[in-house]
Amino acid sequence: MAIQTSNLGYPRIGLQREWKKTLEAFWSNKIDEEQFLTTMKEIRLQHVKVQQEKGIELIPIGDFTYYDHVLDTAYMLGFIPSRFSEFTSYLDVYFAMARGSKDHVASEMTKWFNTNYHYIVPEYEEGLQISLKDNRPLRLYEEAKQELGVDGKPVILGPYTFLKLAKGYTQEQFPTILKQLVAPYVQLLSELHAAGAPAIQVDEPIFASLTKKEVQQAKEIYEAIRKEVPNATLLLQTYFDSVEENYEEIITFPVSGIGLDFIHGKEGNLNAISKYGFPADKTLAVGCIDGRNIWRADLDEVLELFTTLQKQVQTKDIIVQPSCSLLHTPIDKTEETHLSTELFDALAFANQKLEELVLIHSALTQGTESISNELETYRNVHHTIRSSAARNREDVKAARTALKEEDFSRPLPFEKRYELQQVALELPLLPTTTIGSFPQTTEVRQTRKEWRNGVISNEQYEQFIEKETEKWIRYQEEIGLDVLVHGEFERTDMVEYFGERLAGFSFTKNGWVQSYGSRCVKPPVIYGDVAFINGMTIKETVYAQSLTEKVVKGMLTGPVTILNWSFVRNDIPRKEVSYQIALALRHEIELLESSGIRVIQVDEPALREGMPLKEKDWDAYITWAVQSFLLATSSVANETQIHTHMCYSNFEDIVDAIRALDADVISIETSRSHGEFIDTLKHTTYEKGIGLGVYDIHSPRVPSKDEMYKIVEQSLEVCDPKYFWINPDCGLKTRRTEEVIPALEHMVQAAKDARSLLKTNA
């Protein structure tokens, strides 16, 4: 039995975010297309080289992208919306689909399963000619072979997952379109096989949550493909959960090997193997290193997994690999020497995870004595962090133990609260507001950098923040918004800002991961017990309120989003970490309220993305996620209005959860999903305050008043005007001032027109 190391995907962004910088330079016309392509090639090949040097045998090729791998697949198969037909060059079409243009809205963007990565949603249109427009994986495979002598493993998104992620067709059309994908996939795989690809990784993460009928449908497609490409080595790759429910059928698929996630789907996959075994003529690819977190592996536990598998599986070959692509982890921890020794030692970023794969390979092929020193080191590291004071705070345990049922609910029901709030706040019908942040200009970022580097004093920095806050309070007053925000100029990131002010968090210097397009985030590390220290938002919010007679919202990030957008300790349940965060935020909310802030927004944009992939596991997650929000927000007076915000979600799955949050007002992304949530509300009622975003802030285009009015009009068909709010989709941090002001002016005008119409019809 042969044992090989493999990787499923490598972070794209570059050690110093070279990828991001190159993209943004190209978009702003600072470099031309030739320079863009040259630099991207250098970055791409460097990533292959790193994996080669680390000792990975099956190196992924084609996981690199200029924006998003799902968008790559859509372009490759000809899923190009007709509204982009005026664009002729590849890059013009590609980036118009991703980002929109002056005259055309971008394709929708949404979360990649339950991660914090976003993909561009493929669009199907009637009359679409599906064909292999561009065999990009082949070009990149040949490039790595010619330039580096690397006989890599091409990575492609599988046909079933691709079409399931796409939109624009009816369920009745799905089988027909799926069959139309066979020919381009046959051509793609045939050409890769003919070029000598030793193995081809076909990603099908959707397989973790399919029905029996869907699995049979997928199998028929793979049989049709295999019939035409009988000799290619196809590795069917699943991840993010187990395939337990359909394992018996999946192992009969006509593929050469199957990749299973033994981190996030360990129990289910082991149960399935125990029950049904594994085909002796197939390769088992074992996802044994966590591709979604940053902690060192427990090597003893991993080796125990292989011992269990080797007792139950008499397979042809074994592949040792991460649980999923390393896209979700930072690249290398070597620059994080500012961290405490106990924390630094416990970390493993992408490059360290590759080293762990090689260690496991050595243990499996040469015996555990070959890595005895490393095993001892790992055991000591795990013991040190488990027993650290940061993970064993008595005050945090006491606060958790003292919680009572009444800590999780508001005193009065929504209708009675809202009446009191209307009297207290004196807002008009269809009140307007924004989601929280305003443009972080070059000046804002540069001033923050100077402050952090000690170039300017605390006093100078605070004066600058106050100046920006006052400027935008005046802008908001002039625009005519009803509920204002302070703008969040002091915040780099909506999670990092709070993590820096709570116990139990730590921060990397270079722990960047891709969120969407060129947007990278640096998730905090929750390594210890979370606890409140001092007020986090009081000063800036109270200052903003002192500048205006209008209502100013306090702005906080919710406990579940802080959890889901952080790298979280893995020694206690996520629910317990979420409750710790909620208790700390509860203290902050009480301080805001006692300081005179009457509207407090607690954002939960990541609540949906944390849901397990399998429907059977949803209730348990939703229960503690909702309880976390209620724990944070339920101690305020009835007159204090609690807002929340969500974005990029399949909300039809969680309408009941949204209702259970008991927020007085929720704002939801609507425009980029082309009105899907409006359709959801046609089939269910939502009887609390709600604002459906009227324009997409992720595109640089400024929408017209009429576009926004149309969304308001559609929204009022399904929402009670008494409870309806008007707002953008998300915060405006990434937009430019010259885009934001006219867009908000159009939004306020659309609100005025809608009010006038409602009064006329009253």
Curated annotation (Swiss-Prot):
Instruction: Keywords in alphabetical order, please.
Output: Amino-acid biosynthesis, Metal-binding, Methionine biosynthesis, Methyltransferase, Repeat, Transferase, Zinc
CDD domains found in the cross-reference section: CIMS_C_terminal_like, CIMS_N_terminal_like
Purpose of the protein: Catalyzes the transfer of a methyl group from 5-methyltetrahydrofolate to homocysteine resulting in methionine formation.
The residues that hold Zn(2+) are: H645, C647, E669, C730
Instruction: Kindly indicate whether the keyword Membrane belongs to this entry.
Output: no
Pathway the protein contributes to: Amino-acid biosynthesis; L-methionine biosynthesis via de novo pathway; L-methionine from L-homocysteine (MetE route): step 1/1
Which InterPro entries does UniProt cross-reference here? Answer: Cbl-indep_Met_Synth_N, Cobalamin-indep_Met_synthase, Met_Synth_C/arc, UROD/MetE-like_sf
Binding of L-methionine: at which residues? Answer: I435, G436, S437, E488, D603
Question: For 5-methyltetrahydropteroyltri-L-glutamate, which residues are the binding ones?
Answer: R17, E18, W19, K20, K111, R519, C520, W565, E609
List the protein's name.
Answer: 5-methyltetrahydropteroyltriglutamate--homocysteine methyltransferase
Active site per UniProt: H698 (proton donor)
Where does this protein hold L-homocysteine?
I435, G436, S437, E488, D603
**GO terms classed as biological process:** methionine biosynthetic process; methylation
Cofactor(s) this protein cannot do without: Zn(2+)
Which family is this sequence assigned to? Belongs to the vitamin-B12 independent methionine synthase family.
**Cofactor: how bound:** Binds 1 zinc ion per subunit.
Molecular function as annotated in GO:
5-methyltetrahydropteroyltriglutamate-homocysteine S-methyltransferase activity; zinc ion binding
Q: Which SUPFAM superfamilies is this protein grouped with?
A: UROD/MetE-like
Q: What class of enzyme is it?
A: transferase
What chemistry does it catalyse, as a reaction equation? 5-methyltetrahydropteroyltri-L-glutamate + L-homocysteine = tetrahydropteroyltri-L-glutamate + L-methionine
What Enzyme Commission number(s) apply to this enzyme? Answer: 2.1.1.14
